[in-house]
């Protein structure tokens, strides 16, 4: 008979063993009395030795037969977590670290008060900025503008000449325009879009939907598909800055502008473009 689980953590692993192990260890070190469960999903990136290590570290280790991307990979882990019928499922990036001992207690208190479907924590980054609440695109006009921008970036990244001009533009922009102080994420908010790198689903949410994340995307903009679901089904999404998690990446990227980087950026933008085009299609279907 399976023990009663208060919270299940789903961690999606892809190649970076150090981050994944630090993420798991941060959960294990937390001083809370509630029973918890850790599910690690490998997106078809582990060697046999790495898989063995993750099997030992996690409570459940699920190995995908191919790289499923963000949404499908996490949904695979969530399906495993559902077997334990936890009160909450926390889906967190493998490059996040939890250091807050009352993390689970805070989630429980928020649920008792708000009966949320999804909860987003304050996501602390190296740059000091909070990426929650997430500024999701909410209109077709915004999505169309983002599609045009994505196409432009793909064109720039494929041209050495355009890449050089982009570097000059960015450097001048940083010299001439001082960055504004970031104000996002200071106050508790309801009915907001939440960042996908750390999101807590309640039991009532994951029982309502077969797939917690929309299955159609590979990478990027999963938040907008959650936002469509939130508005359509009038779900309760809340953001609590008193609940905290550290995200190693954040938005403070140190660009080195080499050819390998641009291959990665092209891959990134191509997947962003696919997600945005799909989002636009769903918005049009909703209108019609």
Language-model region placement:
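Glycine-rich, basic loop-to-helix element that forms the pyrophosphate-binding segment
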Residues: 64-81
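A short, conserved alpha-helix in the catalytic core of glycosyltransferases
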Residues: 192-243
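Short beta-strand-to-loop acidic/aromatic patch adjacent to the donor-nucleotide binding site
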Residues: 86-97
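A conserved acidic beta->alpha catalytic loop
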Residues: 40-50, 66, 93
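Short, well-formed alpha-helical segments that are part of the catalytic scaffolds
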Residues: 16-30
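Active-site-adjacent helix/loop segment of glycosyltransferases
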Residues: 168-169, 221-288
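Conserved donor NDP-sugar-binding/catalytic core segment of glycosyltransferases
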Residues: 100-134, 139
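A recurrent flexible, glycine/aromatic-enriched loop bordering the glycosyltransferase active site
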Residues: 159-167, 181-201
